[in-house]
UniProtKB/Swiss-Prot annotation:
Organism ancestry: Bacteria, Pseudomonadati, Pseudomonadota, Gammaproteobacteria, Pseudomonadales
Name this polypeptide is given: YcgL domain-containing protein PputGB1_4120
Cited InterPro entries: YcgL-like_sf, YcgL_dom
Gene3D superfamilies: YcgL domain
Disulfide bonds: none
Pfam families for this protein: YcgL
Domain YcgL span(s) in chain numbering: 3-87
Length: 97
């Protein structure tokens, strides 16, 4: 079950992406989601299949969401993941003396 999908980047939130079936475009995305997501910016198109690996998403869940609701929203990683990679000096810069 291969799917051709378009992936859109959020202008409001770094690393937030919206997956939709290319044939449907944005028509199945709920109107209430777009104010939160912002005006979708097309990033690229991709052929998805159960065998394909995605960097941060479970391909089975993505395909299931595309079939059932017409879109899949990839949330950005938790802020804790960003903080883990900062040098100790930067983490303590604003600490009171």
């Amino acid at each position: 079950m291969k799917r051709i999908c378009s992936i859109y980047k959020s202008p409001r939130k770094n690393e937030m992406y919206l997956y939709v079936l290319k044939a449907d475009g944005l028509e199945r995305v709920p109107e209430g989601l777009l104010p939160f997501f912002g005006t979708p910016m097309h990033a690229f198109d991709l052929v998805l299949s159960p065998e394909r690996k995605l960097a941060r998403e479970d391909i089975t869940k993505v395909l299931e969401n595309l079939d059932n609701q017409g879109y899949h929203l990839q949330m950005p990683p938790a802020e804790d993941e960003y903080i883990e990679h900062l040098p100790e000096e930067l983490l303590r810069r604003n600490d009171p003396v």
